[in-house]
């Protein structure tokens, strides 16, 4: 059976891995998943990520903790296959009053809500991270 929402699966693996205090989590790789992992790394929510394998690449994300507590408090899928959520540049949400980030898919690639606002772009809101 094929996976209906691989992004939700990725976010759930990160959430469950941190709840179980795992060092890292691995999952099947895809370009969009790697772009999300890159954004999470740039924002400081994960330590690192690697892609290994040729035929079936595997994305391994090294989770980040601060004083034994997970850095990611909440990670929530917004736009999903059954209900896509698009926001214009003026309607992009501020997660936790600006403390968290919304990951947005724009015509110039994946970026945070802050970067999209600076570039004057809207797009599909993939997830919230705080």
From Swiss-Prot:
The lineage of its organism: Bacteria, Pseudomonadati, Pseudomonadota, Gammaproteobacteria, Alteromonadales. It comes from Shewanella loihica (strain ATCC BAA-1088 / PV-4). Belongs to the universal ribosomal protein uS8 family. One of its GO terms (molecular function) is rRNA binding. Keywords: Ribonucleoprotein, Ribosomal protein, RNA-binding, rRNA-binding. Gene3D superfamilies: 3.30.1370.30, 3.30.1490.10. One of its GO terms (cellular component) is ribonucleoprotein complex. One of the primary rRNA binding proteins, it binds directly to 16S rRNA central domain where it helps coordinate assembly of the platform of the 30S subunit. This is Small ribosomal subunit protein uS8. One of its GO terms (biological process) is translation. Part of the 30S ribosomal subunit. Contacts proteins S5 and S12. HAMAP family: Ribosomal_uS8_B. It comes from the Bacteria. InterPro entries: Ribosomal_uS8, Ribosomal_uS8_CS, Ribosomal_uS8_sf. SUPFAM superfamilies: Ribosomal protein S8 (SSF56047).
